[in-house]
C-alpha cells in the first residue's frame, strides 16, 4: 500500500460526487482528481479528430497523444482552455458512450494513478475504488435516486442559462445508469469495503461532513 492516502468516491451521473469530492479535498488540503473530466476530454478530442465513439481501438490510441493539464480549477487540452466546453450535455453523452471501451479505460489508468501525490488524493469517478485505487484508505459509493439527480442537473443547467427539460434529463440519466452498470469493463458498482452514502435528502455540507468523519475513523 502506498503511504499516500486516497479517498475514492464513486457514483452514478449527477449524484453530487464531484462537488463532495472537491470540497473534501479542499478541507483536507489534498489533491483532487475528477476522472470524469478525463473521459470528457477524450470525448471532446475525438469529436475534433472525427473519431467514431464506437471505434475503441482508435480512441485508445488517441489518449496518449493528448496534452492534458489542470491549472487553478481550469482544464486545458492541447493548450486550449476547455473547462466549459467539456461540460456540455452532448460531450457528457459522448463520454459515456466511449467509456465502455476497454482500450479507452486502460489507456487512462496510468494517467489517473499519476494524480496520487503527497499529502493525499480525493478521486471521484465510476471505478476509482474498484479498479484505479483498490487500496484506498476510504471507499465511498455516493448515490441518490434518479429523480433527485435529474432535478439537481436541471437546476444546474438552468442556473447556467442552459435550457433543459426535466423529463429528458431523467431519461438520459436512466440510460447512462444502465450503460454504466452493464458494461463489460469496470462496470459501476459498490466496491468491496465501500461505504454507501445516499444523498437524496442530504445537503452538500452534510454529505461532506459524513465523508470527513468516515475518513477520520479510517485513519484512527
UniProtKB/Swiss-Prot annotation:
Q: Which SUPFAM superfamilies match?
A: P-loop containing nucleoside triphosphate hydrolases
Question: Pfam families per the record?
Answer: Cytidylate_kin
Keywords in UniProt for this one?
A: ATP-binding, Cytoplasm, Kinase, Nucleotide-binding, Transferase
Q: Name one GO biological process term.
A: pyrimidine nucleotide metabolic process
Localisation: Cytoplasm
- Entry's Gene Ontology molecular function annotations: ATP binding; CMP kinase activity; dCMP kinase activity
The EC designation for this entry is 2.7.4.25
Signal peptide range: none
Entry's Gene Ontology cellular component terms:
cytoplasm
Detail which positions bind ATP: 11-19
Q: Give the principal location in a single coarse category.
A: cytoplasm
Between which residues do disulfide bridges form? none
Swiss-Prot/TrEMBL catalytic activity:
CMP + ATP = CDP + ADP; dCMP + ATP = dCDP + ADP
Where is coiled-coil annotated?
none
Q: Which NCBIfam families has this protein been placed in? A: cmk
Please state which protein family the record places this protein in.
Answer: Belongs to the cytidylate kinase family. Type 1 subfamily.
Q: What is this protein called?
A: Cytidylate kinase
Gene for this protein?
cmk
Amino acid at each position: 500500500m502506498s503511504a499516500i492516502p486516497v479517498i475514492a468516491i464513486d457514483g452514478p451521473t449527477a449524484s453530487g460526487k464531484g462537488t463532495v469530492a472537491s470540497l473534501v479535498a479542499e478541507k483536507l488540503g489534498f489533491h483532487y482528481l475528477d476522472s470524469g473530466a478525463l473521459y470528457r476530454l477524450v470525448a471532446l478530442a475525438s469529436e475534433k479528430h472525427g473519431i467514431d465513439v464506437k471505434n475503441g481501438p482508435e480512441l485508445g490510441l488517441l489518449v496518449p497523444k493528448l496534452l492534458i493539464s489542470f491549472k487553478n480549477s481550469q482544464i486545458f487540452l492541447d493548450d486550449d482552455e476547455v473547462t466549459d466546453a467539456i461540460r456540455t450535455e452532448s460531450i457528457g453523452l459522448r463520454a459515456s458512450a466511449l467509456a465502455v471501451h476497454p482500450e479507452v479505460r486502460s489507456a487512462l489508468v496510468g494517467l489517473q494513478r499519476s494524480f496520487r501525490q503527497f499529502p493525499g488524493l480525493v478521486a471521484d469517478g465510476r471505478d476509482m475504488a474498484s479498479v484505479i485505487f483498490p487500496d484506498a484508505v476510504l471507499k465511498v459509493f455516493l448515490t441518490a435516486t434518479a429523480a433527485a439527480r435529474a432535478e439537481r442537473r436541471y437546476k444546474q443547467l438552468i442556473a447556467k442559462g442552459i435550457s433543459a427539460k426535466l423529463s429528458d434529463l431523467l431519461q438520459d440519466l436512466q440510460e447512462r445508469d444502465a450503460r454504466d452498470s452493464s458494461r463489460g469493463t469496470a462496470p459501476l458498482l459498490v466496491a468491496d469495503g465501500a461505504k454507501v452514502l445516499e444523498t437524496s435528502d442530504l445537503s452538500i455540507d452534510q454529505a461532506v461532513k459524513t465523508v470527513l468523519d468516515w475518513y477520520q475513523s479510517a485513519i484512527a
